[in-house]
Design a protein with these regions (language model features):
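Sec-dependent N-terminal signal peptides of Gram-positive bacterial secreted proteins and lipoproteins
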Residues: 6-24
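A residue-level marker of the well-folded mature domains of exported/periplasmic proteins
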Residues: 5, 22-341
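N-terminal secretory signal peptides that target proteins for export/translocation
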Residues: 1-3
Length: 341
């Protein structure tokens, strides 16, 4: 009997222990997710699905103009649609070639899946593009092309044709004769070269009675461009037309025309959009401008990079289009979505 009592006592203790274990197990359950969350936070910031996304840095020519903000919006939309991660950056000024090269070097060091680049100086980046090629990193150009076969594609406006259209409009508006000046953002990027040459060559070929008296380069800087334009207007009191090859350039021209009281005397034609240009066109101070499709440029460059990574073929040149706009169509359904303030 004594042994029986001992056995019963042991069985009772085991039963109590089992009951206590059963009661305390649910209390421990909430701790598992908390522990899991802490582990995920310390091991890697992105979720498991995000870690598998291709990373594509997008390096632009600048960040200061609304044009680049529109390109950024397009590239971000493409990233969301196509399930890739991007970063978008550019130097503070479109004259900072060295800064852009540093950005490209930093991007290469991260070993990205691909790189989208709008080169400020097409020759200065060749060595880094060759490095990317040796690492198997595809390069997609946007806005500006590069004088190299390394980029698999370039999403861009046909700037030569677009600037030629601006020249045709200028000739029409000044009556086919007179003095005209040109203000360009730079002479090193593909856009600067092509817009200058597209305008100048069209005038030379088709309008022998129009004289281009000056070509300046203002780095897209408003103050510098204003000073350059004022000097040209003061040196040429009979100037009939002024072409600005990007938003920063044309703002300088508009500032100069306004400050010198030349509104209505000089036909002003610009490129891109932005609030100051749009207001000037509506007010009649500016005749019109060429608009690109900046959102489309941003979207198409990321899309081309993703297609390349997926083994799909892409066109070497992706023409994103251009349009002439003035007071008659600035608010039209065709033009309005392409403009930005």
């Amino acid at each position: 009997m004594k042994n029986s009592r001992v056995i019963m006592l042991l069985l009772g203790l085991l039963l109590i222990a089992a009951m206590v274990g059963a009661c305390t197990a649910p209390a421990a359950a909430p701790a598992a997710p908390a522990g899991g969350e802490e582990s995920a936070a310390t091991e890697a910031a992105p979720a498991e699905g995000d870690a598998a996304k291709p990373y594509i840095p997008v390096i632009s020519k600048g960040f200061q103009h609304q044009f680049w903000q529109a390109v950024k919006a397009g590239s971000e939309q493409a990233a969301a649609d196509l399930n890739v991660d991007i970063t978008f950056e550019g130097p503070a000024s479109e004259s900072e070639v060295d800064k852009q090269i540093e950005m490209l070097q930093a991007a290469l060091a991260k070993n990205p899946a691909a790189i989208c680049l709008a080169a400020l100086d097409t020759k200065a980046v060749i060595q880094l593009l060759e490095e990317a090629q040796s690492k198997g990193i595809p390069i997609v150009g946007f806005d500006s092309g590069v004088d190299s076969d390394i980029p698999v594609a370039t999403a861009t406006t046909d700037n030569i044709a677009a600037a030629a259209l601006a020249a045709d409009k200028m000739a029409e508006l000044i009556g086919g004769a007179g003095k005209v000046a040109v203000l360009v953002h730079d002479q090193t990027s593909r856009t600067g070269i092509d817009r200058r040459d597209g305008f100048v060559n069209r005038i030379a070929e088709a309008y022998p009675d129009i004289e281009i008296v000056n070509i300046d380069y203002g780095a897209g800087d408003h103050l510098k461009s204003t000073d350059l334009a004022k000097a040209v207007i003061q040196a040429n009191p009979d100037l009939k037309g002024y072409f600005g090859a990007n938003d920063g350039s044309i703002i300088g021209v508009l500032n100069a025309v306004t400050e010198l009281g030349k509104e209505g005397e000089i036909v002003v034609i610009g490129y891109d959009s932005g609030k100051q240009q749009m207001d000037a066109i509506r007010a009649g101070t500016q005749a019109g401008a060429i608009t690109q499709n900046p959102i489309g440029i941003g979207y198409k460059c990321v899309e081309a990079a993703v297609k390349t990574l997926n083994g799909e073929s892409v066109d070497k040149i992706i023409d994103t289009g251009f349009f002439w706009y003035d007071a008659t169509n600035i608010d039209s359904d065709e033009i309005k979505p392409l403009l930005y303030e």
